[in-house]
C-alpha cells in the first residue's frame, strides 16, 4: 500500500494584466507569423491544472495590481491600492503562500519587478496602500519565506532614525542578498 504523496513543487505563475483575450490574441498572432489562420497554442493553457479567476476589485470595475494580486493570493476581494487587507484597510488576509509556509513548505517569490511591488507583495504583506514600500519591505523581512528574487527594494531606506535599512534588516533575518551576477 503506497501512501499518496502531494506534489513536490507548486509553481503559481501570474501573467499580470493577462486574461483569456490576451492569450487568444497571442495564439492568433503566433499562427499569423507562420502564415496560417487559426491559432498556435501556447504551452501553459495545456498544463494539467489551470484556473481562471475574477480579480475585479471591491471598489472599482477595473482592478489594479494591488487588489488583483490580493484576490489571486488570498481568494478575497479588496479595494484598489490595498495589499493583503480586507476593505476595512486594517484586517490582514492570509495568502496561499503563508498557508503553504505554515504547512511546512518552502516558499519563494520571484518577480520581474521590485520585490516590494504590488503583485508580489500581496503574498506576504498587509498594507493599506501599495506605495507604502518601506512598510511592505518590513513585511517581507518578517515573512519567514525562504527566497525572494526581483529587482531590488523601491524604498530600502529606514523609516525612522535609529532603524536599519531594509538590506540590513533582511540580512539580520537570515536572507542573503545578491546584487548583479553574484
Can you describe what each PLM-predicted range is?
Residues 2-182:
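N-terminal catalytic scaffold of extracellular/periplasmic and nuclease hydrolases
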Amino acid at each position: 500500500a503506497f501512501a499518496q504523496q502531494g506534489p513536490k513543487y507548486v509553481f503559481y505563475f501570474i501573467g499580470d494584466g493577462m486574461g483569456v483575450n490576451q492569450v487568444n490574441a497571442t495564439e492568433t498572432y503566433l499562427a499569423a507569423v507562420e502564415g496560417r489562420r487559426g491559432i498556435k497554442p501556447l504551452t501553459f493553457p495545456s498544463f494539467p491544472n489551470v484556473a481562471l479567476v475574477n480579480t475585479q476589485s471591491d471598489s472599482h470595475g477595473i482592478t489594479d495590481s494591488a487588489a488583483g494580486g490580493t484576490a489571486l493570493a488570498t481568494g478575497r476581494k479588496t479595494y484598489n491600492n490595498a495589499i493583503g487587507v480586507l476593505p476595512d484597510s486594517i484586517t490582514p488576509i492570509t495568502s496561499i503562500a503563508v498557508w503553504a509556509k505554515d504547512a511546512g513548505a518552502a516558499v519563494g517569490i520571484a518577480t520581474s519587478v521590485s520585490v516590494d511591488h504590488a503583485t508580489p507583495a500581496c503574498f506576504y504583506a498587509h498594507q493599506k496602500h501599495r506605495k507604502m514600500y518601506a512598510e511592505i519591505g518590513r513585511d517581507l523581512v518578517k515573512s519567514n519565506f525562504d527566497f525572494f528574487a526581483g529587482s531590488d527594494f523601491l524604498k530600502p531606506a529606514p523609516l525612522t532614525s535609529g532603524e536599519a535599512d531594509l538590506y540590513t534588516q533582511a540580512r539580520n533575518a537570515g536572507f542573503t542578498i545578491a546584487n548583479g551576477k553574484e
